[in-house]
Amino acid sequence: SDGMTPTKRALELQPVIRDVLSKLESSIQPETDFNPATSSRTFRIMTSDYAESTLLLELLGRLADCAPNITLDLITPSDVTFHDVEQGKVDMAINRFDELPLSFHQKVIWYDNFACVMHRSHPLASHYDLETYLKAQHIWVSKTGFGVGVGIDPNEVQKLGWVDAELTKLGKQRDIRVFTRHYHAALQIAKRQSLIATLPSKAAKIFTDDPDIVLREPPFDIPPIALKMAWSALLHHDAGHIWLRRLIGDVAAEMQ
């Protein structure tokens, strides 16, 4: 789930912050003594359930091979702020961001399309179009982690996510019966109940080898989402940080 958005004041201060950090960044000299094979460094990464279930799962396998003593401290968006990332208290944020402070360095890790997940016995698996999709019951994975539990009207959920935003453009609305912020929960519910989960493809493909699960392309267009990593200018020239960013890029490329 996405939980970090800059405040209005933070956005107003972006030019000033960018100038200050730019000067600090230029004074930092690259480190030359980082050795991943022997380092016992801990990297703190703010990330979402989506990135944990896809990218970071593969990253852990690579770390076990090339940097066995490295530790990852994975933090949820609700546990940190942009200020923590900006100060270098958190090594990086990996998530889907609508907007980021200008003081951050950032890079797109990948773009991901969507897929619909359902049990193979679901009627939709054999007769699948927009009409039958809308008649089915759905699981909604919250973009922000907020749902009806905090007073949001279920009839207005189309304002909160990519899937429902596109349905709204078509003048349509789906029947959502479960709200969750966890992709694994959505996948398990889709497997055991007669509900449909429309998820980013890389998360949906966790169940590719499960004979009870069927994946379908959505019966309407949904723009791809961008998974990004963002980090402080204070860490931009850090040798260990540079190594981790490159490793993440390599892992992401292999997953394309």
Question: What positions do the PLM features span?
Answer:
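Acidic, Gly/Pro-rich loop/turn segments at junctions of secondary structure
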Residues: C66, S78-A136, G145-F146
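Central regulatory/effector-binding core of bacterial HTH transcription factors
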Residues: S40-L100, T180
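Ligand-binding "clamshell"
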Residues: L100-N113, S194, F207-E217
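Short amphipathic alpha-helical coupling segments at ligand-binding clamshell hinges
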Residues: R9-V16, L55, L59, D129-Y133, ...
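Secondary-structure junction motif
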Residues: L124-Y128, L134-L170, D238-A239, R245
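Hydrophobic hinge/microswitch elements
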Residues: S78-T81, E86-V90, I152-I213
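A late-sequence structural motif
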Residues: E131, V141, I213-Q256
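Alpha-helical "hinge/linker" immediately C-terminal to small N-terminal DNA-binding modules
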Residues: T5-F34, S40
